[in-house]
Amino acid sequence: LEEARQIFERSCEEAHKAYLALCDLGVPREDARYLLPHGFETSLVVTMNARELMHFFRLRLCRRAQWEIRDVAREMLRQAREKAPYIFALAGPSCVSKGSCEEEKPCGKPYGSMEELLEE
């Protein structure tokens, strides 16, 4: 049992060192963390009202958002549109909700429609 614990701790230390090295090389933390063991769990619990959800969708459904949170936001939008279709009819990044990008650094690939956003 002691030997197993030592193996586990060594592997975690090495993974953490590799993670820090990747970060030092400029790899975004949210991407570098994929080499960490599944034991380094990330949990997300949020409470939002409709206004906060609209803001979240505007930011996190943009193609410039990190892919993993974009996938979570897309599923949240699907469920929100099921429960409150009128409220969330135009939710999403500004390229969908307003017809043009409001980002300081646009991605150059705006969504053409809500359907395209939800199907991606």
Per-segment meaning from a language model:
Residues 1-120:
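A conserved ligand/cofactor-binding region detector
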